[in-house]
A protein has these predicted regions:
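Short catalytic-site patches enriched in acidic/histidine residues
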Residues: 1, 85-89, 126-196
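A composition/biophysics-driven feature that prefers long, compositionally simple stretches
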Residues: 1-112
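Alpha-helical structural signal in soluble globular domains
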Residues: 51, 71-76, 120, 135, ...
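Conserved short loop/turn motifs at secondary-structure junctions
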Residues: 61, 118-127
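Active-site pocket-lining segments that scaffold enzyme catalytic pockets across diverse folds
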Residues: 107-118, 129, 136-137
Length: 196
């Protein structure tokens, strides 16, 4: 609900516009971007518009809230708006050897947790989905992930829900258990889905 935006001009300084109350959560990156904090009485969209200046074309991320975009449009009336993915999508898909190695490592760590599930090292029967989810999360961290982004465990009829939230349902013998989990390891994400 509060605007946080990275403004990347064609030339010049990159700026992270962030609510003042969130500044402590932003890791400073000197030489990469500066931080402009906005207070409760300031209009963050006006700050972004000022940073954009006379930009002729503005690429906007797909996750930008419509309310902020609608406020921004009249503040930069001569600009053309495009989807950021159309501009940087190809760049994001291109990986050097170190990035590929980081992706492989993150995937391999998740694969090891999946193997632990299949081999029974993470017990299922008689335990709740939430307990198994917690075990998967702990194993991802033990395998080198910095953060667990999700650990969905869905037993029986719950497996029909693609983004089920693990709960108090107890897993019974001879039923399908869908496990969808992943996290971030050295800045790169893993994501794996398996049925046990």
């Amino acid at each position: 609900e509060r605007l946080t935006m990275l403004v990347i001009p064609q030339s010049g300084e990159v700026t992270m516009v962030v609510p003042r109350l969130e500044v402590a959560r932003v890791t400073p990156q000197p030489g990469v971007f500066s931080i402009t904090a906005w207070g409760e009485t300031e209009n963050p969209v006006a700050i972004v518009a000022k940073l954009l200046g006379n930009a002729k074309s503005i690429a906007v991320g797909d996750q930008m809230w419509a309310r902020f975009l609608v406020e921004l449009l009249p503040l930069v009336p001569t600009a053309t708006f495009v989807r950021a993915v159309d501009v940087v999508g190809a760049l994001r898909m291109s990986k050097d050897a170190s990035e590929i190695a980081a992706l492989v490592a993150a995937g391999a760590a998740a694969d090891r947790v999946a193997t632990q599930l299949h081999s029974g090292l993470i017990p299922l029967i008689g335990r709740t989905e939430a307990q198994v989810s917690a075990d998967i999360s702990a194993r991802l961290i033990a395998e080198g992930h910095d953060v667990v982004n999700f650990a969905i465990v869905a037993a029986g009829e719950n497996a029909a829900s693609p983004h089920h939230h693990a709960g108090s349902r107890v897993i019974a013998k001879n039923e399908i258990v869908l496990c969808d989990f992943g996290g971030t390891m050295n800045g790169y994400c893993s994501d794996i889905t398996r049925c046990v």
